């Protein structure tokens, strides 16, 4: 099985360059001291998130560890996929919710955890479940948690500096008092630009995990079928639109909120299900 570390490194590099440029531009308003403290806070938060990503996500979903006796099919599938990829066996969890979804978390394969909801276990057959688990394991093998935290750290710096710009513009404490429009522009467009980059990277991660997972299982159409069921299931039984759950939504295999929910749109980091299905079907057609 061939993963895509080069593609992930390229995305990380582009992300660093683009967001770092924004940081330099925004930080130039205040000088080195403000830039230093904004960077320190944002990086600190995301380093903590990186090392505790599994705990944060599992806690938000009220997930419980399961044994092989409790979830024999899930264990068998994950063990087969991990063995085929020459990777260690992750910890397995189940979240007792009707919302059909799954996610993987952990900073590397040795610290990985995979969680399925009871809802997804009820609606998928074994072939589809295998495809979903292959997708989730691919996120771990592709080091997507690292990319998310890099994006989060840089976006956090930009947002913090933009907030400073707004505050300074309000109270007139910036040395750029001659151009208040520049402050307004920076405070508004900085966070928007950071969000756009984060969403682009996140959507790219989902496409990549679809492809890698389909290659791991050898069954792209099973994942396409699973995505159809999950999409319909989410509309019938979405997760409640709570901020704690929204902060972990990017880890899910599909947007866990009902289409049209304000919070679902605000925190959506997933490409359209139809596009993902189309790409998977193209993989089969191109064989």
Swiss-Prot record:
Statement: the UniProt record of this protein carries the keyword Isomerase: no
Segments passing through the bilayer: 10-30, 33-53, 145-165, 181-201
Gene Ontology biological-process annotations: proteolysis
Protein name, per record: Protease HtpX homolog
Gene Ontology cellular component list: plasma membrane
Family: Belongs to the peptidase M48B family.
Species: Mycobacterium leprae (strain TN)
Domain of life: Bacteria
Gene3D superfamilies: Metalloproteases ('zincins'), catalytic domain
Topology of the protein relative to the lipid bilayer: Multi-pass membrane protein
